[in-house]
Every structure is written in structure tokens, then in C-alpha cells.
Amino acid sequence: MVDDNGSSPEVEGAEGAGAPLLALLRVDGLNQTQTRSPSPSFFGSYNISEDVYFYFNGLPTSTELVLNATTSATSATLSPAMVATGGGGTTTPEPDLSEFLEALPNDRVGLLAFLFLFSFATVFGNSLVILAVIRERYLHTATNYFITSLAVADCLVGLVVMPFSALYEVLENTWFFGTDWCDIWRSLDVLFSTASILNLCVISLDRYWAITDPFSYPMRMTVKRAAGLIAAVWICSSAISFPAIVWWRAARDGEMPAYKCTFTEHLGYLVFSSTISFYLPLLVMVFTYCRIYRAAVIQTRSLKIGTKQVLMASGELQLTLRIHRGGTTRDQQNQVSGGGGGGGGGGGGGGSLSHSHSHSHHHHHNHGGGTTTSTPEEPDDEPLSALHNNGLARHRHMGKNFSLSRKLAKFAKEKKAAKTLGIVMGVFIICWLPFFVVNLLSGFCIECIEHEEIVSAIVTWLGWINSCMNPVIYACWSRDFRRAFVRLLCMCCPRKIRRKYQPTMRSKSQRFATRRCYSTCSLHGIQHVRHNSCEQTYI
């Protein structure tokens, strides 16, 4: 029954009781055969379909229920997000988010749960990185400070940006949190994503400086300089995000559509932000990693060549050789054998090096004849026992050897770090390149993108996958971070489990013991301290 004003008494009673819009629609949709004429106070002049509301509440859609509005028949299916203000001045109750979530179909609920789980994994993994660098002193390096800044940006993406985007996508681009928070959320999305990309760019520059100029790098990359670079990253990211939102709100024509969270599609801003946020950092990263790869190949080749030259001349182990003093291999060999009874041979290789250890250790190398005999009790002691005839020469030579081993170990760690960060860069390109291609294409030719909303959602979440992948890459490729992660994860475990994993971690006392081992070998020349074991402990 409809009164003179065109409104239903049941509806008025429900509205007076403060029932939500979905309940009103449920009351009106009970009689499927009755043709209704809802008043303008319901939907007014809005060309709005009730399909999604009926779908969410298990009611017949417009294909089964004919709705004849007083102004015009509803023909298009729009988003359920709306504020229906009628010509009579009556405002319908605003849709409630909780009711929408309760009425979601199972497939949408599963998608929402998956996206929330993905957001949690991003926050959890990056929080591990942050806590690891804070707790473990051996991770207090300039590179790891940059990685911490990257983890902070990625963690905030998972904490602030992803959950609201998940709701927005699952509810078919419906925004329930107001216009102000929409603008803030969009600006934070730009801020954190740009900061993540720029941090990767700074990390690539840091690795480039460390590998191409390793001697001056420790003096150049101080804590203050690292803090300055991190501050520059966040200031630049803020300059791209927040002022643009202020400009966007001032230049926007009219009010933002109700229950929508749109962002500027101005071509100038899209080109500017994409260039600063992605394309320039991408060029810098590609350039630096190409140079890093070339430098690593050259240094690795030179180390191998230098080691082989000394191996052919003296027959010693690799870590006791190759000293950069400007001299030749013959000079280095004479330094080792010059003070004892061995008698260093000339360049023709006819000489021999022999000695007798106090514990019946003996070995003989005949370079000319090509024969080698060895009768040691402990073969691993040969590199040290071969030098015991001349204490001063042994002391100098071992000091050089240990210095070389430290350089080799440091270079190996630098090269592995560069490889790890190269993988990070590759994942970064795969994740973010589609988004910025679509971002620019939407400014030039939005019609060229079929199913634009679906494509935008896919490439956006693909970019956010990068924030979740970085901690996984650190755990898989960085032994230091892997140790720190195990420590953190075992803190809540029983003491037996913590003790089980404790020997696999290099503690502070173990690092000091390693240094004492090198000091003892260098100063006192103890014959039974194995060179190889010292090196393995150090590395």
C-alpha cells in the first residue's frame, strides 16, 4: 500500500525505527510480484540499481524484480556505494560496513582472508628485519641501515596500505572510510611505495661504492652520511606524495563521488611521479649493478691469476700466498726461505724447499723433478711448519697471509651481498614495472586498457608483492640475517630448543676468540694452530 506521498508505510515505520538501508530493502523485496513505486526520498533522481544490495542479502535482483522509479526506470548496475538523498529532503540510512562483510559470498570472503594474510606476512617479515638489525650488533653496518629503512617502508605498506585496499577491492571499489582518510591513504600509498623504491636505489649505490672503491669506502660511508641518505629518501618521497594530494584536492572539480576513493589522473602528475618514483631509480640501479658485475668479474679474475702464479712457484696453500708488495713471486719466495736452511731456488725452478719439524713433521718439494714426498703427523699443519726455521720471516709472512685472508673473506662477503641485492633488484623490476607502465598508459590512453579496474588492481598488488618478497630474499641469501631471524624466532621457544640452535650462531665471544686466534698465530707462531681452521672460524 502506498500513501499520497508515494512512500510505503512499512518503509516509514522501519526508517523511523532507525533500521539500516539493507533492512529496508529486505522489507520491500519480500513481495516479488508486487510492482513498487519507491518515493524520490529513497533514490531520488539518482540512476541507481539495487542489484548489489539484493545480492548481498540473498534477495532477487533486478532481473527477477521489476523496480519502477518515479523518475525513470533503473537500467544500469552501479556500485553499491551511494548516499541516496531524495528531493523531499529525506536521507536514507548510510550502508554499514559490517553488514556488507556479513553478507559477502564465500568466494569474496576467501579472497579477503588471503589478502589480509598477505598483508600480515609483509608486516611480519619486515618486522623481523628491523628487529634483527636493532638487536644484533654485527648487523650494524651502513648497508644494513639502508635495508632497515627499506624494511620500515615495506612494513608500513603492509600495515597501512594493504588492508584498506583489500576491503576496497573486495567490496567492488566501495570506500566506507570518508573522503579525508581516502586522500591520506592515497598519499601514504605513494609515500611508502616511493620510499621503498628509492631505498633500493640507495642500496645499489652503496654496494657500488663498496665494491669499486673498497679502501676508501669505510671512511666515506659513515653513520652520519648513511643517515643523511636515508633522510633524503624519505624527504623526496614525502615531496612527491603529500603536496600532490593538496594540489589534487584544490584542483578537483566538484565533490568526490560518494563511497568512492578516486585519485588524480592528470597526465603531468602521472609522468612526473612515475619518473621520480620508478624510472630514474631504475636507470640508476641498472647502471650500478652493471658496474658492480664488471668490477666483481675483474677482481675475481685478478685474485685467481695471482694465486695461480704463486702456487706454481712455491707449492704452498692458497691462503699463504699472493702478497701485494710490489715485488715478484721470486722475492716473496726468498722472503720465506731466505733465513733458513732451505736454500731458495731461482727462476728456473731447480731449487728445493725442505725442513724438519720438531715433532717429526717433514715434507720435501722437488720442483725440478716434479716429485713431492710428505710424511706429516698432521697434514693440515704443513703451511705453518714450513715456516718455523726463520721466526721473523714466519711472523711477517703469516701477518701478510692473514691480512690477505681477511681481504679475501671481505671481498667474498661483498660479492655475495651484491648478488643478493641483484636478486632484490630483479624482483623489484618484475613487481613494479607493470604497474608504472599501466600508470602512464592510463594517462595517455585510458581506452587502451580493457577492464581497467581489474588490470589496475592486479598490477597494484603485484607491486606490493615486492614489499613481502624482500625479507624472504634476505633470509634465503644472507647468512647473517638468517642467523638473526633464527635467534628472534627462537626467543619464544623453550630453553632446550634455544640451546639446540645456539651453536650454529656466531656469538660475540666467538668473534673475539677468532681474533685472539689470529693474534696468537701471528705473535707467537704456535705450530699446532691450524691455519685453515682459523680461517673458517673467521669467515
UniProtKB/Swiss-Prot annotation:
Question: What PANTHER family does UniProt report for this protein, alphabetically?
Answer: ADRENERGIC RECEPTOR-RELATED G-PROTEIN COUPLED RECEPTOR, DOPAMINE RECEPTOR 2
Extracellular compartment: which residues? 1-113, 167-189, 249-266, 442-453
> Could you tell me in which tissues this protein is expressed?
Expressed in both central and peripheral nervous systems.
Question: What protein name does the entry list?
Answer: Dopamine receptor 2
- CDD domains, from UniProt? 7tmA_Dop1R2-like (cd15067)
Q: Where in the cell is it found?
A: Cell membrane
Provide the family line: Belongs to the G-protein coupled receptor 1 family.
What is its membrane topology?
A: Multi-pass membrane protein
Cytoplasmic compartment segments: 135-145, 207-227, 288-420, 475-539
